[in-house]
């Protein structure tokens, strides 16, 4: 099993497929590197090296009590990039993982980065703030934490419906829903709850100004988890030269529901 050891001793799992120009994937909340298997197989079969890791506290990585914050997540990515000596890497972040890769560029620069892709990402700001009243009300996130601490398995099981848009007519197999629950339950409860605080409260607006590589923003306008109008749309406006693609009626989990469209768009961006 491929792992590296972070600066604080946390062991972090990653998978590394294929050869060619590298693409590094950062997963969403409740998930792990396995969420990317269809994108990784597609791109690695077409001449790219694809790498995905389990964020600390999730999947097969260690479960430290502390360090579940975006500066640490970004530093973990920096260490993985250095560990593998990646150059001209394209960073792809989904949901809270979009914050990981944006913060990486803000903290560590873009010398090793060829491009950035933000998929249904929480950037530039997910939660409400006095100067960002359009953000998601903080009591929504407080409820998430309360329900997770009461019955995590049921919360995640119920979360599948809005995540995949099943409650809006999207068709997702029972197998995928079961896999999502299984992946989510591998994670540390502490990390799962801490990450709610991280993605609800972290302001990435300063990070957006530091992004100086070609950027593709993809978001579904049917996203019930991370609303397009206050995240993806704004991020594309704040990042200089960003390209925006909006998937009509797509849910938050469009990497599953719109996998072929996403794969083709990723490949086109890599070939630009």
Swiss-Prot record:
The annotated dependence of activity on temperature is: Optimum temperature is 70 degrees Celsius for esterase activity.
Q: What organism is the protein native to?
A: Pseudomonas fluorescens
Entry-linked Gene3D superfamilies:
alpha/beta hydrolase
Chain's role: Hydrolyzes phenolic esters, such as phenyl acetate, nitrophenyl acetate and naphtyl acetate. Can act on a wide range of esters, but reaction rate and enantioselectivity differ significantly depending on the substrate. Shows a preference for esters with small acyl groups. Also shows low perhydrolase activity, and catalyzes the reversible formation of peroxycarboxylic acids from carboxylic acids and hydrogen peroxide. In vitro, enzyme-generated peracetic acid oxidizes bromide ion to bromonium, which reacts with monochlorodimedone to form bromochlorodimedone.
Q: Any other comment in the entry?
A: It is unlikely that perhydrolysis is the natural function of perhydrolases. Instead, perhydrolysis is probably an accidental (promiscuous) activity. Perhydrolysis is an important reaction that makes peroxycarboxylic acids, which are useful oxidants in organic chemistry, for lignin removal and pulp bleaching and for disinfecting wastewater and disinfecting equipment for food and medical applications. Perhydrolases were previously known as metal-free haloperoxidases.
Name of the featured protein: Arylesterase
* Catalytic residues (UniProt): 95, 223, 252
Q: How does activity depend on pH?
A: Optimum pH is above 9.0 for esterase activity.
Q: Where does acetate bind?
A: 29, 96
Per the UniProt entry, the effect of residue 100 to E is: Small decrease in esterase and perhydrolase activities
The record's comment on protein family reads: Belongs to the AB hydrolase superfamily. Bacterial non-heme haloperoxidase / perhydrolase family.
State the Pfam families in the record.
Abhydrolase_1 (PF00561)
Query: Which reaction is recorded as catalysed by this protein?
Result: a phenyl acetate + H2O = a phenol + acetate + H(+); peracetic acid + H2O = acetate + H2O2 + H(+); a percarboxylic acid + H2O = a carboxylate + H2O2 + H(+)
